[in-house]
C-alpha cells in the first residue's frame, strides 16, 4: 500500500453536499448513486456496528518505474496513430489486488488485536470513499 489511514464514520457534514449533488442530477446515468442516496454517507448503516474505517491507497505504478513514464504516456496520447489503454486497466484488476491486500491487512490486525468484524471494499460499496480517505489523511 502507498498510504493507510483511519477515519471515523460520522459523515453527517457531507450529507448536504451529497444530497445537492444528487438533486442536481450530476450522477447522470449512474442510477445506483441515487438508489443508495444518503446511505453513502452512513457507513454504519452498510455494516452495522462500524466504528472506524481503514482507508488505503495503492499507486498504479511501482516506485522504481522512474519519472519518465508520464512523458511516455503523454507522447502516446499525442500520437493519433496509437491506441492507449488507461494505466489503471493494465495488468491485474486493481479491485482484486487491493481486496487481497486489504484482507491480508485485516488478518494481520486480527493477529495483533484479536478478532474484529470487518468487510473489505474496493470501489464496490455505496460509501463516500474520497470523503473517508480525506478524513483519514
Identify the residue ranges that each predicted region occupies.
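Auxiliary alpha/beta "docking" domains used to position bulky ligands
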Residues: 1-137
Amino acid at each position: 500500500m502507498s498510504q493507510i489511514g483511519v477515519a471515523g464514520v460520522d459523515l453527517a457534514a457531507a450529507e448536504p453536499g451529497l444530497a445537492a449533488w444528487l438533486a442536481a442530477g450530476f450522477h447522470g446515468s449512474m442510477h445506483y448513486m441515487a438508489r443508495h442516496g444518503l446511505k453513502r454517507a452512513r457507513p454504519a448503516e452498510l455494516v452495522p456496528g462500524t466504528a472506524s474505517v481503514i482507508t488505503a491507497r495503492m499507486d498504479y505504478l511501482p516506485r522504481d518505474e522512474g519519472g519518465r513514464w508520464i512523458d511516455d504516456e503523454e507522447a502516446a496520447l499525442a500520437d493519433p496513430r496509437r491506441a492507449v489503454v488507461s494505466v489503471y486497466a493494465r495488468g491485474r484488476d486493481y479491485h482484486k489486488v487491493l481486496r487481497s491486500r486489504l484482507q491480508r491487512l485485516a488478518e494481520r490486525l486480527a493477529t495483533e488485536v484479536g478478532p474484529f468484524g470487518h468487510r473489505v471494499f474496493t470501489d464496490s460499496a455505496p460509501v463516500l470513499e474520497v470523503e473517508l480517505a480525506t478524513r483519514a489523511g
